[in-house]
Curated annotation (Swiss-Prot):
It is found in: Midbody. Belongs to the OKL38 family. Its EC number is 1.14.13.-. One of its GO terms (biological process) is cell differentiation. This is Oxidative stress-induced growth inhibitor 1. It comes from Mus musculus. GO terms for molecular function: growth factor activity. Its main location: other. No monooxygenase catalytic activity in the absence of NADPH. The lineage of its organism: Eukaryota, Metazoa, Chordata, Craniata, Vertebrata. Monooxygenase catalytic activity. Involved in regulation of cytokinesis; promotes RHOA activity, probably acting locally at the midbody in late cytokinesis. Monooxygenase activity is involved in stabilizing transient structures between daughter cells, termed intercellular bridges, before abscission. Regulates differentiation and proliferation through the regulation of cell death. PANTHER family: OXIDATIVE STRESS-INDUCED GROWTH INHIBITOR 1, PROTEIN CBG05349. Keywords: Differentiation, FAD, Flavoprotein, Growth regulation, Monooxygenase, NADP, Oxidoreductase, Phosphoprotein. The modification Phosphoserine is found at residue 12. Its cofactor is NADPH.
Length: 478
């Protein structure tokens, strides 16, 4: 346990921390790097291939990106994210990656300790967050270079580990190890507290921006507990001037909401299949494993099961020709294994002969009931019912963030308060150039909680938040 952990998680701390970050995945790690005094500058003589951006960068030579107008710099950029600062940071880190190029980043990084902002990063797992919960051999959706954090390329890190990238992509195990290693190599470990579970975040009921209230007491109270080695709970209470939500969306799996979903053979994560294989309760001669879902997690489960010759029934509610199906949006050359799953889904019906032994698909089938005798009941596209015997069920239809530690579980923070929080449809409403909540001063949201779902783009949110937090520290009275 570091001194930070002793001092800052104790109940007797007198001074509030400037920043507490909840979540230690890529967003939290990147923000910690920036708040630790690592400041990005444009390399002298670097020329960006985007003419408009290059002209703007040339207007302020020697001024760090964090100290420039992010709205001005990001204006006119286009790409695969709705976040303007995400597009800006991505363009600076990977200038021509969308065109298949490999131009080096135009950024250089300078350590300026006097600009570091004291902070803590609280996470349930080791640094890397949910990446430590993903089956290690799974190949990442994004290319390896897109998983990199600032100033340490995944490919360079893997080269030192005497590993190479498969199809330009790394395994989930590689990435989890990379993020954990990044925190160590960049000297960030003293800011990170693993095994920390936040149970409540509260803030003063004051008028927006009231300096009198903020001067007399910290705005935020962060309560929770540390999981000890003997699985006990050690409570902690923190006070902070700013809180950053960076917990991602893997906390709570989405449910079908049908009878039998809580039976012991029904699971909602891929690790259950791994455990069943290790225990020998599932094998090539057992009844099929039922996989429900048509996203990438379900595809990963299909690939994992087929690798071990486990029979699979794959059920999903969409048509295989639905343009909204994620497989219909992925380039075949970059993602050959997902294209293979898509091909199997298209070609194989449970009612037709199968050239893929051990795999059957159930397109446009709605699960109705799971029975104690390991029977699964479905409604088919014609309205009839189908019954299948299965060894186990994996329901992989997405997940929801768990913000139960916030007042009203964060319902007042989203874009449409009448609808539930959804990273894709109804994220937390933030200022796009600071990532500060539009509803609560001092509260920030990064990553999927703010609508950014790929590691490649979550770093832009960290840049925006760091810029805002650094400006606050500069303005803070002595």
């Amino acid at each position: 346990m570091t001194s930070w952990r002793h001092d800052s998680l104790g109940a007797s701390s007198s001074e509030p921390l400037p920043v507490v970050i909840i979540g230690n995945g890529p967003s939290g790690i990147c923000l910690s790097y920036l708040l630790s005094g690592h400041i990005p500058y444009v390399k002298p003589g670097a020329v960006h291939p985007h003419p408009l951006l290059q002209r703007k960068l040339a207007e302020a030579p020697g001024v760090s990106i964090l100290d420039q107008d992010l709205e001005y710099l990001s204006e006119g950029l286009e790409g695969r994210s709705q976040s303007p600062v995400a597009l800006l940071f991505d363009a600076l880190l990977r200038p021509d990656t969308d065109f298949g190029g490999s131009i080096d980043s135009v950024l250089s990084w300078k350590r300026q300790k006097d600009r570091a902002v004291p902070h803590l990063v609280l996470g349930r797992n080791l640094p890397g967050g949910a990446w430590h919960s993903i089956e290690g051999s799974m190949v990442t959706l994004s290319q390896g270079q897109w998983m990199s954090l600032p100033d340490l390329q995944v490919k360079d890190w893997m080269r030192k580990k005497c590993r190479g990238l498969r199809n330009s992509r790394a395994t989930a195990g590689d990435i989890a190890h990379y993020y954990r290693d990044y925190v160590i190599k960049k000297g960030l470990s003293h800011n990170f507290v693993s095994g920390a579970v936040v149970t409540a975040v509260e803030w003063a009921k004051s008028e927006h921006g009231s300096p009198e209230v903020q001067a007399s007491s910290p705005l935020f109270q962060v309560n929770g507990y540390l999981t000890t080695k003997d699985h006990g709970h050690q409570p902690f209470s923190l006070r902070a001037r700013n809180v950053v939500l960076a917990t991602g969306t893997f906390d709570s799996p989405a449910m079908l909401g049908i009878p039998g979903e809580t039976l012991p053979f029904v699971h909602h994560d891929l690790s259950a299949l791994e455990a069943a294989l290790r225990a020998g309760t599932v094998n090539p001669t057992s009844d099929p494993v039922l996989i429900v879902g048509a996203g990438l997690s379900a595809a990963d489960a299909v690939l994992f099961a087929r690798h071990y010759n486990i029979q699979v029934i794959h059920a999903f509610r969409r048509s295989v020709h639905d343009p909204g199906l994620v497989f219909n949006q992925l380039p075949k050359m970059l993602y050959p294994e997902y294209h293979k799953v898509q091909q199997m889904m298209r070609d194989q019906s449970i009612l037709s002969p199968s050239p893929y032994e051990g795999y059957r698909s159930l397109p446009e089938h709605q699960p109705l009931l799971f029975k104690e005798d390991h029977q699964a009941v479905f409604q088919d596209p014609q309205g009839g019912q189908q019954l299948f015997g299965v060894s186990m069920v994996l329901v992989l239809i997405g997940s929801h963030p768990d913000l139960s530690y916030l007042p009203r579980a964060g319902a007042d923070l989203v874009i449409d308060p009448d609808q539930p929080l959804s990273p894709k449809r109804n994220p937390i409403d933030v200022d796009p150039f600071t990532h500060e909540s539009t509803h609560q001063e001092g509260l920030y949201a990064l990553g999927p909680l703010a609508g950014d779902n790929f590691v490649r783009f979550v770093q832009g949110g960290a840049l925006a938040a760091a810029s805002s937090l650094l400006k606050k520290e500069t303005r803070k009275p002595p």
